Regions:
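Glycine-rich FAD pyrophosphate-binding loop
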Residues: 42-69
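A short, Lys/Arg-enriched amphipathic alpha-helix followed by its capping loop at the start of a domain
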Residues: 37-50, 236, 240
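C-terminal segments that line or cap access tunnels to active or ligand-binding sites in enzymes
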Residues: 206-221, 283-285, 290-520, 526-540
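Extreme N-terminal leader/targeting segments of oxidoreductases
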Residues: 1-25, 43-51, 551-589
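Conserved FAD-binding subdomain of flavin-dependent enzymes
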Residues: 72-113
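Helical element adjacent to the flavin cofactor pocket in flavoenzyme catalytic cores
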Residues: 203-285, 289-291, 303-304, 309-311, ...
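Rossmann-like flavin
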Residues: 100-207, 219-220
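Glycine-rich Rossmann-fold phosphate-binding loop(s) that bind the pyrophosphate
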Residues: 29-35
Length: 589
């Protein structure tokens, strides 16, 4: 497997890999990583669909990319997905997946046209004083010490950041900047999150620095992620004969190591309460989704808080499977799951979905976001962060294009919100978020969008239906780590197995993205089948001097060099540099 850039490799069709007709594939998990692996087995690996088996524990494909309607409880959306124009593997995939809504076009075409006609941007990034615009005004407000520390982090080798927290490398003044407000709430980082991962994010999205304050860097799907991404991919695979076998609870993959050679020999699973096995030969390829950020999700509804009785450090079936596999490693080459799943207090947050058609509430929504949520177009343009709640639940909320579900009534608006601090009291509701019913969480949100206090109780109870989800491991992949804590996509010496998903290690890309999962799926197939075509490299904006200079300009809020808070020595050095480059192409840059 090798990386490439440019259209020569991107537009080429690889030859059929040698021996593929004798091979079969077993893919554990039907999240984006597993579905993408199946896609590349079909399209580029040219494996017959009948020889590809997706093993899924649940009754629905999609993994963490879900979105569904419970007939009795309402709509559930655990999370949302923000996309980038340089998700190279994602767009390489969806350019060949047919739309299930618009005949004759691809999912990429449909998505491209939508975001061209209705580009995303926010008119209110944060609120204060119960619904007033906080006027962050696209400013980062970085002080000199914070700006220098970010620059140093950008340039620090990953090896030097292993097992370090963000708080280990950035000054206290950084937490009060708009940069951190944008960053933390957009990506769900915490102060104790991995400094290594923050460096990757800085490098990966340096070309989007100017679009972070108002989300103009982002693109969104028309409907929820399940209907817009998962369903078309599933239908594509099914049309090629790929089988999804539901109710398959995989417990272990038995791997034998002889010298430097590692071979998957057996899959152990439970179906209908009975433990069973699948024996494997070297021509049987196994793709393992190790770990899951939504494992042990706990659901609540309008009148019930989520039941957290089963939540404890390390508990979860995806972790149990990974631990069973990791225990077979001779030198830790299958990763260290305990690094990610052993501190629920650090890795949890909670989301909620509010459904309403109440005109009074919608007027308050429009007062904040300056748009009509029932227009069918961009509404909030990304999350609105409630600055007043930073020491409480730390709420952010968003309304994507409506309807979010094809079955959604045209008068109903779905609001998604989340809180980073589930153990703290709310500003209005004096309970920990995780202990609250949907109705109580709705009250807190109504309070922050400016609804009169005397009206909040009645509206939350009768004009809204709120479902909730507490996710103990949703930030697990942000835990400080070293390179060996996640197994390589294809470990050294592995003959017929690979690790895929958010807890597999691939260089340069960032977790908590659709692209990361899909990239591991593509890389795993290309490696095990030796597909002779380049995997598109992670977009290299960090190597583009134009993007770096542009990012510096926006990071200091577009101040000219002579207005920056520089010391006398620094100013003199800048003057000398500008004199040296005068009349050159560097000056033009």
């Amino acid at each position: 497997m090798y990386y490439s850039a440019g259209t020569y490799e991107a537009f080429a069709h690889p030859e059929k890999p040698e021996g593929v007709d004798n091979k079969s594939a077993y893919i554990i998990g039907t999240g984006l990583a597993g579905l993408t692996a199946a896609f590349y087995l079909v399209r580029d690996g040219q494996m017959k669909g009948e020889r590809i088996h997706l093993l899924e524990k649940l009754e629905l494909a999609g993994g963490s990319c879900d979105g569904y309607r419970d007939i009795t409880k309402g709509f559930y959306m655990r999370g949302g997905r923000e996309m980038d124009n340089h998700f190279e593997v994602m767009w390489d995939t969806f350019r060949d997946v047919p739309s299930i809504e618009t005949p004759g076009v691809s999912v990429l075409d449909e998505y491209y046209w939508l975001n061209k006609h209705d580009p995303n941007y926010s008119l209110c990034r944060a609120s204060v004083n119960r619904g007033e615009d906080a006027h962050t005004d696209k400013q980062f407000k970085l002080d000199k010490e914070s700006a220098m520390a970010l620059s140093k982090l950008f340039l620090t080798p990953e090896k030097d950041l292993e097992d370090k927290k963000i708080s280990d490398v950035l000054p206290d003044s950084f937490w009060d900047t708009n940069f951190w407000l944008y960053w933390q709430t957009m990506f769900a980082f915490q102060r104790w999150s991995s400094a290594l991962e923050m460096k990757r994010y800085l490098c990966r999205y340096v070309h989007h620095i100017d679009g972070l304050p108002d989300f103009s860097a982002l693109r969104f799907t028309k409907y929820n992620q399940y209907e817009s991404m998962i369903l078309p991919l599933v239908k594509y695979l099914e049309s090629h004969g790929v089988r999804i076998e539901y109710g398959m609870d995989v417990k272990n993959v038995i791997i034998e190591t002889e010298g430097n050679k590692k071979v998957a020999k057996q899959i152990v699973y439970v179906k209908d309460g009975q433990e069973q096995t699948i024996d494997l030969i070297e021509d049987d390829l196994v793709f393992i989704t190790n770990g899951c950020c939504t494992d042990t999700s706990c659901y609540g509804d309008q009148t019930h808080a989520p039941d957290l009785s089963k939540v404890k450090n390390g508990a979860g079936e995806s972790w149990d499977m990974w631990k069973a596999i990791a225990a077979q490693a001779k030198h830790g080459e299958f990763g260290n799951p305990d690094n990610f799943c052993s501190d629920v207090d650090a890795t949890n947050w909670m989301s909620a979905t509010v459904a309403t058609s109440n005109e009074e509430i919608i007027r308050h929504i429009m007062n904040v976001c300056k748009r009509d949520p029932r227009s069918g177009k961009v509404t909030t343009g990304g999350i609105v962060t409630v600055k007043d709640s930073t020491e409480n639940w730390y709420l952010s909320w968003t309304i994507n294009r409506q309807p979010q579900f094809k079955s959604q009534d045209k008068n109903t608006v779905l609001v998604w919100l989340y809180g980073l601090h589930t153990d703290r009291e709310g500003n209005f509701v004096k309970k920990a978020m995780r202990d609250c019913t949907g109705e109580e969480i709705c009250r807190e949100w109504l309070y922050h969008i400016g609804v009169e206090e005397s009206r909040i109780g009645e509206l939350a109870a009768t004009a809204c239906n709120t479902t909730t989800c507490y996710m103990p491991y949703i930030n697990a992949f942000f835990q400080p780590r070293k390179e060996s804590d996640r197994p390589k996509v294809v470990p050294d010496g592995a003959v017929n197995f690979a690790f895929i998903g958010q807890f597999a290690e691939t260089p340069r890309d960032t977790i908590f993205t659709t692209e990361y999962s899909m990239r591991t799926g593509m890389e795993s197939v290309y490696t095990l089948l030796n597909v002779d075509r380049g995997v598109p490299e992670v977009w290299g904006s960090k190597y583009d001097v134009r993007e770096l200079l542009r990012a510096c300009y926006y990071a200091v809020d577009k101040k000219p060099i002579d207005e920056l808070p520089l010391s006398f020595g620094e100013r003199e050095a800048v003057k000398l540099l500008l004199k040296k480059v005068k009349g050159t192409d560097v000056e033009l840059l």
